[in-house]
Amino acid sequence: MNAWTSPEYPGRGLAVGRDADGVPFFAYWLTGRSPASQSRELVVNDRELIVRDTSGGPVDDLRHYTAATRGDDWFILGNGTQVAALTATRATHPDLQLALRQLTYEPDPPIRTPRITASAVLRDDELTDVVVGSARAYGGAPELTEHPSVYLARIAPGTAVTTTTYDGTATAITTNGRPVTVDVSRSWASVTDAIWASLTPSLRVAVVTVRLDRDIFADVRTAAR
C-alpha cells in the first residue's frame, strides 16, 4: 500500500479492497499485549479463517473465533463471534448495515472493544455491496452502542476500506472502529508485508491477506511472530 500506517496498538484490524490491478482481497491482522493474546494463530481453511489458540489453554470467545466465512459469491469478515452469527442469518438478513445494528461492543469493560465487521458480494474481480462497520460504545454514554459504517456499491481498483479496534498505545488504549479508505498502489500479494512492517514488533501476532477472485481461500499471504 502507498503508506500503510498503524498506531502503536491497533488491536485487530481488517481491510477489504482491490489492488492496483483490480484484484480483490481482504486482509486481517492480530496484535496483542498479554501472553494469551499473543498465543494465537490465523488458520486458513477453504471457506473459513479461524483465530486459534496456540498455548493449549482454555478457549476464550473474545480471542478465539471464526474471523471470516465464504459463500459462493460473498464473504463476511470480523473480529469475533458475530461472524458466525451473521453467516447463519445471511440468507434471511443479507443487509449487513441493518444486521450490524443488532450487535453491541465486546463485554470487556472498561475498554469496550468494538466489534468490527466487513462484507461484500463477489462478481469475478469486482467487489460490490461492500459494507465495513462496527458496533462501538457511544462516546458520552458508553452504555449505548453506535454503529459507524461505510457502504460502497463498488470498490474501484487501487482502493481499500479499513478499520481497527484501537488507535492508541499499549498503555493508553483508545477505541476505534471507524472505517476509512486508503490507496492501494501495489499488488495484493504485498499487502501482508506492508501491514506487518507497520505493526509494532513487540505487539504484532499475525497477518493474512486472501485473494478473493477464487472459489475458496486458496491464494493467501501470511506473516506471523
Please provide the spans of the model-predicted regions:
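Conserved short alpha-helical segments that host acidic/polar catalytic motifs at enzyme active sites
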Residues: M1-R225
